[in-house]
A protein has these predicted regions:
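Post-Walker A alpha-helix
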Residues: 36-37
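Glycine-rich, often acidic-flanked micro-motifs
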Residues: 12-14, 18-28, 41-162
Length: 162
């Protein structure tokens, strides 16, 4: 797969930029990816670059996200990119909490949300290498949250130490 050869892969996530940095909201269907992107747009003026499948790529010593044509039901697919500030694994709750995800768990979660051919060993190995390096380069946090501004405030405080 040419994408994997370029140290890049699709990640099932909503991708926003705020202050020139990217945040990837990753989760299963109905986890709140589009909701979080919309909340960040409304309350922090973030730009939603992609609503369903961003491309992540290992570049230099960091991780960069790119918009893709695969936007799901959001219809949002912009040709933009940004260095990744964090990957946020989503869950729903009545209170907002942000916790760091240990590397082994972050690796499993990330690999499970990437798109690659599981029947081809070299694709599996390449995707695993990208996932391992991605979690070593950028913070992966779990945000369990309410669908309102308080979730934005909680994540912002955790990522920017406000």
């Amino acid at each position: 797969d040419r994408l994997l050869e370029a140290k890049a892969a699709f990640l099932h996530s909503s991708f926003i930029t705020v202050g020139g940095e990217g945040i990837l909201f990753a989760g299963n269907k109905q986890a709140g990816k589009s909701t979080q992107a919309a909340l960040w747009n409304k309350y922090r003026g973030a730009l939603t670059v992609n609503g369903d499948r961003a491309v992540i790529r290992l570049e230099g010593g960091g991780l960069r996200a790119y918009g893709s044509a695969f936007c799901g039901s959001s219809g949002i697919a912009l040709d933009e990119s940004a260095p990744v500030k964090a990957i946020v694994l989503l869950g729903q709750a009545s209170e907002n909490t942000v916790t760091p995800v240990p590397a082994p768990e972050a690796f499993r979660e990330l690999l499970g949300k990437m798109t690659y051919d599981t029947s081809v060993q070299s694709s599996v190995e390449a995707a695993a290498a990208i996932a391992a390096e991605a979690v070593a380069r950028v913070p992966v946090v779990r945000l369990v949250c309410t669908p309102d501004e308080r979730s934005v405030e909680a994540l912002e405080a955790a990522l920017w130490r406000k």
